[in-house]
Amino acid sequence: MTSYLSNDTEAKLKKTKELPPHIHFIGIGGIGMSALAMILAQKGYSISGSDQKKNLTLKKLEENKVHIFPTQVESNIDEILKVHGKNILVVKSSAIHRDNLELCKAKKYNLKIKHRSEILAFLIEEKKSIIVSGSHGKTTTSTYITTLFSYANKSPTAIIGGIVPLYKSNYSFGKSEFLIAEADESDGSLVKFNPNIGLITNLELEHVDHYLDLEDLIETMKQFAQKCECLITNFDCDNLRANIHGSKWFSIQKIINIDFALIPKESNGCEIIAEYYEKEKFIDVIKIPVPGIHNLSNAAAAIAACRVAGILFKDIKKGIEKLKLPSRRFEFKGLWRNRLIVEDYAHHPSEIDAAISIASTIIETKHKLSKILPRRIVTIFQPHRYSRTKKFQKEFAKTLSQSDLVFITPIYSAGEDKIEGINNKSIGHELKKIKPNLEIYTPDNNQNLIKLIKEKTLENDLILIMGAGDINLISENLFLELLNNKLISNDIAA
């Protein structure tokens, strides 16, 4: 298959205006902001940023000569102006509140201020772009596309919403003309992009803090679809099939009238064997080395994007066996007291259902992970945002009811105000209605949660830790304690 990109695509890659020589990111430690900052630093811009939460990302930024402010105060802007003058650009994300001190000072000085989506749009205009959107699977699909491009020796620039195993990073500054990135629909900013190849993985109501209802979200996705030179969409998604008509369809359920089909034949909770078809013609049997039927759909989407971009299937196949999930996507963290610890970013009922489905398949097929044969599913869920919890409280309860033991932590607010009557205990109450005999715990803090994990879990449990907030700190604390105990034991033995 030759590239779908038209011959006059180069005209679209018009010479874009340069950004100011110095760019300051408010909240630079975020997964999306840090990737943009690193790409711009690699392009030769002077970069600074501020973030009040310490993490490894900030350390990496500093190693790449990015100046980091550990606080967000007005004096940061003054310090930047002393060095660089007023010809600077301030970048913010939707997470930055309008009362942010740095943002207020930048407005007071009448400095140029742009949303992070405008910076991504700038980078998209410079390259042949593959932009991935959808309610679920964006990070996994864009990680797959980036991996397949890399193993096909295409060296893409990539801006990803998670850590790509191949790069051990959320970005790649490539040498080719291609850019692969996610289009975040959470705030509607994806309508600013003009992709050469657009991809929508699926579509269902999400981000209820921004969208009134499903129709509101569909309208935004239609606007994105209209701006894509070529649009690849998921035939298996009812909402997409009914509302958005793409240039190309992919499917894991159907072959007839489908451009790219990946039909599952075997699964063991660790990998999936599937038959690959193009325009109803059988091409090959391939092994997808990641678990979960939803990840097979993500793989089908990634293969479709690569083929539309003109990559030969034989070159794509080289990378398929190297596919790995990004960080916090059913990520096996290790063994803790002979219990399997797995982390997943799931924070929507459909995502939780998909993660629990993988865990169930592992148990049903008696698939061993790290020499342990898991017997029970223990879920630890941190709800993300009060608005989402209020909207999907019953759905959360229904999907969590598939577990053998459930812990629900306090809600990670993500900056939202509390909603009266909406908390971890209200989800627990709904869960009890569905499964009265299920063992459910709703601790008030992480200290109590860790205590309960030690008391209530058993050897050979598969402990699935889910959420988009800081719930990953739980596994870090468990393993840190294990390491400290080992060090103490070694000291005593010595």
UniProtKB/Swiss-Prot annotation:
Binding site for ATP: 134-140
EC number, UniProt record: 6.3.2.8
GO molecular function ontology, one term from the record: UDP-N-acetylmuramate-L-alanine ligase activity
GO biological process terms on file: cell division; cell wall organization; peptidoglycan biosynthetic process; regulation of cell shape
Catalytic activity: UDP-N-acetyl-alpha-D-muramate + L-alanine + ATP = UDP-N-acetyl-alpha-D-muramoyl-L-alanine + ADP + phosphate + H(+)
Pfam families recorded: Mur_ligase (PF01225), Mur_ligase_C (PF02875), Mur_ligase_M (PF08245)
Pathway(s) per entry: Cell wall biogenesis; peptidoglycan biosynthesis
Record-level GO cellular component terms: cytoplasm
Listed SUPFAM superfamilies: MurCD N-terminal domain (SSF51984), MurD-like peptide ligases, catalytic domain (SSF53623), MurD-like peptide ligases, peptide-binding domain (SSF53244)
Alphabetic keyword roster: ATP-binding, Cell cycle, Cell division, Cell shape, Cell wall biogenesis/degradation, Cytoplasm, Ligase, Nucleotide-binding, Peptidoglycan synthesis
Subcellular location: Cytoplasm
InterPro entries cross-referenced by the UniProt entry: Mur-like_cat_sf, Mur_ligase_C, Mur_ligase_C_dom_sf, Mur_ligase_cen, Mur_ligase_N, MurCDEF_pg_biosynth, UDP-N-AcMur_Ala_ligase_MurC
Nucleotide-binding in keyword set: yes
Keyword Transferase assigned: no
Record's function text: Cell wall formation.
Family indicated by similarity: Belongs to the MurCDEF family.
Name this polypeptide is given: UDP-N-acetylmuramate--L-alanine ligase
Organism encoding this protein: Prochlorococcus marinus (strain NATL1A)
Protein's gene: murC
